[in-house]
């Protein structure tokens, strides 16, 4: 199915500063309009969001996630630099915890990698995400920004406590494992792609 719903919520002051002058506007627009089924979908989503059971589920999952993230960070403080976020939208920033890989990355020509420390942290998150998928069938994402290197932790609302426990036990197992070979493979493929 499809669900092309969008919304912009903004206060008057911000709106005026962003859109108030024609010469400095960056026009926020959407191509989604005139689709009746999207209106029905949006209304049903609002109905679900307003149900007390939904709010209770979100609060319960948020509390559980917060506790599990704190425990994970405490148990792996040598590998986790920071846990960010709130509710069901969180991220884990990892340290680049392999000194041998750090030495190897230092030898990569500087023009291929602008910020080697950031690259190592993003590489670490990438390898952890790949291991979660390949070994535990858990699909995660890494923030795909030049300024961010965190593993996104934002579970679907259809999961239960057993799913949360499985995720954190799997992530803990990955953090206890030796990721050097997987990381070397990713570095090799990265360099190969840059030299083409």
Task: State what each model feature region is.
Residues 1-196:
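Conserved N-terminal phosphate-binding loop of PLP-dependent enzymes in the Aspartate aminotransferase
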């Amino acid at each position: 199915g499809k669900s092309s719903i969008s919304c912009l919520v903004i206060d008057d002051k911000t709106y005026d500063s962003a859109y108030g002058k024609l010469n400095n506007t960056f026009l926020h627009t959407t191509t989604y309009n005139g689709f009746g089924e999207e209106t029905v979908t949006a209304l049903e989503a609002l109905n679900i969001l307003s149900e007390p059971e939904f709010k209770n589920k979100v609060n319960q999952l948020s509390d559980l996630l917060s506790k599990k993230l704190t425990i994970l960070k405490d148990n792996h403080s040598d590998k986790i630099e920071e846990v960010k976020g709130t509710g069901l939208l969180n991220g884990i920033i990892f340290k680049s915890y392999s000194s041998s890989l750090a030495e190897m990355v230092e030898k990569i020509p500087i023009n291929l990698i602008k910020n080697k420390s950031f690259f190592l942290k993003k590489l670490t998150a990438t390898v952890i995400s790949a291991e979660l998928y390949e070994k535990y069938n858990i699909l995660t994402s890494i923030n795909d920004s030049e300024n961010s290197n965190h593993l996104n932790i934002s579970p679907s609302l259809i999961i239960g406590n057993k799913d949360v426990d499985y995720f954190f036990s799997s992530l803990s197992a990955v953090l206890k494992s030796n990721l050097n070979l997987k990381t070397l493979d990713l570095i090799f493929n990265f360099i190969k792609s840059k030299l083409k």
